Amino acid sequence: MEIVKIHKVDDFFENPDEVRAAILQMEFQPPTDTDNWHGVRVVPTDRVVAGVDLEEMIDEEVKFRIPNFTYDEMVLAYHITSEEIRNHFDVEFEQASKHFDGDACRIVGLIYLTPNPPKNCGTSFFDDEGNKVTELENVYNTMIIYPADILHGPTNPFGDTKENSRLTIVFFLKKYK
């Protein structure tokens, strides 16, 4: 099996509470019939939240961690996953939530924004046969960055309101050529 680097950045925002509060004020929407994700999301038109230019911060961190990587487009979303989404699957959640972020997507990442989350509610990574290889814990204000072609998914959903559920900023870096 190929060894792949997963980057972890602690204490990503200087003001995570303000960023979180601003995001929670937004109108989250469920997926459309053509979307391939579960939960609710906001796809922002303005990438500045609580005085933070998210695109610039993410871009700088990715370039620092993966110096030779270039991309054509960054897609951002604020994503909430609650305990309720378990009802959408007939199999164990961790098995059902495994996925690749394909097409033109090359690098993906997320920033955890729920304070004091339960244990075992981070992001799981799997080998090509679907066996769990590792899990990164959901730690408030931590960013993770990884290749889009790694099989992965949220380990466990939690919460029953947008304030106490799994809140993340997800980003997808796409290369079209």
Regions found by a protein language model. Name each.
Residues 1-96:
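Non-heme Fe(II)/2-oxoglutarate
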Residues 79-177:
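Catalytic core of non-heme Fe(II) oxygenases with the double-stranded beta-helix
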